[in-house]
Amino acid sequence: MNIGIRQLIESDVFDYAQLINVLSGYGNVRAKIGRLLASGEIIRIKKGIYTFPEYLRRSPLNPCVLANMIYGPSYVSSDYALSYYGLIPERVELVTSMTTGRPRRFSTPVGNFAYFQRNAADYSTGIECMETPGGSFLMASKEKAVYDKALTDK
């Protein structure tokens, strides 16, 4: 295990630029990243976004923070937000978000994420910035989450 990388990268989730910076002393940085991925010392969440294996993380990953990082601009909404607020009894595994971009789905080693397209004119109304120990993220208000749920269920 390359403990040095864990000590040099403070956050549990990091991007390609941070990795390149930490590994700049290696002759072939891309090959080194490939070896770290193959050995399981780092995990690719999405192209350009990485995390450490669970035993090296300082805290559990927050799916809402990841959802905002994986595809943007986006905010967590619909089923996942309703579950977060305790408005539906079901446990929701798929992190649902709204975006002004194209609809997308990502299946990653740390969870599944779905992004539904939202009209740009209505996008920013009713979004709240949530602060957690794992980072901050954008989430729909309770009312907006209900509205987005109605839109995505059409």
Regions found by a protein language model. Give the residues of each.
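Short beta-edge/loop segments at beta->alpha junctions of small alpha/beta modules
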Residues: 1-73, 109, 124
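Nucleic-acid-binding surface
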Residues: 53-154
